[in-house]
Structure formats: structure tokens, C-alpha cells
């Protein structure tokens, strides 16, 4: 079985990576101190990456408030479900609210509308 994680955690990880990518881009800009224009371009791109991560964090925060909160039957901790199937944030137990999918092997394609 492939390694899955909850959708909320995936999006949060993406936003965190944008922050670090922004810092790395700005750090690369420091090496071009002799060219003010080139250094400024790298600094602006880095700040834009950090601002984009802020927007992603805000979006996932708003999405998280609308997610269905359930108690995982495996670890008995509260977790949130986005879509028809998702994973527990704590123990990676496959979770679903759809009675038709109970007992089936976990597959993220169940969340696509073409199904």
C-alpha cells in the first residue's frame, strides 16, 4: 500500500514548503549583491512565495473549519475528513463516511467526481 496522509496535512506541508522555498530564493538573491536588479528580483520572488504560503494557510484554515470531524475507530482521536475518503491525521487509518465504500481498500480516486 502506498503511503498516504490526510488531505489537510498534505496542504499544510505544501504551504510550509513554500515558506522554506521563499527563504531559499531570497538567500540566493544575497549572492547577487553586486547586481541590485537581480538581487531585488530574487528578494521579490521569495517574498511572493511566502505570501502565497500565507494564502494557502488561510485557505486550508477556512477549509478545515468546514471539514467533518469524526473520532477515528483505530486510535480514538478526533480527526477531520475532507471528501468521501481520507486518512486519520494521527494513525493513518482509512476513513469514509460513505456506506458504499466501507470495507473497500483505500483509494484517493474515490474523491474524484468521475467515479
Curated annotation (Swiss-Prot):
Residue ranges crossing the lipid bilayer per the database entry: 18-38, 41-61
Keywords noted in UniProt: Cell membrane, Membrane, Transmembrane, Transmembrane helix
Disulphide bond pairs: none
Localization: Cell membrane
Bilayer topology term: Multi-pass membrane protein
Pfam short name (any one): DUF2614
Transmembrane helix keyword on record: yes
GO cellular component, one term: plasma membrane
Family in the record: Belongs to the UPF0295 family.
Protein name: UPF0295 protein BLi00901/BL05075
Organism: Bacillus licheniformis (strain ATCC 14580 / DSM 13 / JCM 2505 / CCUG 7422 / NBRC 12200 / NCIMB 9375 / NCTC 10341 / NRRL NRS-1264 / Gibson 46)
Amino acid at each position: 500500500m502506498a503511503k498516504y496522509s490526510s488531505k489537510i496535512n498534505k496542504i499544510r506541508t505544501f504551504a510550509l514548503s513554500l515558506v522554506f522555498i521563499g527563504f531559499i530564493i531570497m538567500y540566493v538573491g544575497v549572492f547577487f549583491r553586486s547586481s541590485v536588479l537581480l538581487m531585488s528580483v530574487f528578494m521579490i520572488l521569495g517574498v511572493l512565495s511566502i505570501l502565497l504560503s500565507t494564502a494557502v494557510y488561510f485557505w486550508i484554515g477556512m477549509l478545515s473549519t468546514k471539514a467533518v470531524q469524526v473520532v477515528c475507530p483505530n486510535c480514538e482521536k478526533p480527526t477531520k475528513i475532507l471528501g468521501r475518503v481520507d486518512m486519520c491525521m494521527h494513525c493513518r487509518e482509512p476513513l469514509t463516511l460513505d456506506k458504499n465504500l466501507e470495507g473497500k481498500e483505500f483509494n484517493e480516486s474515490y474523491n474524484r467526481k468521475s467515479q
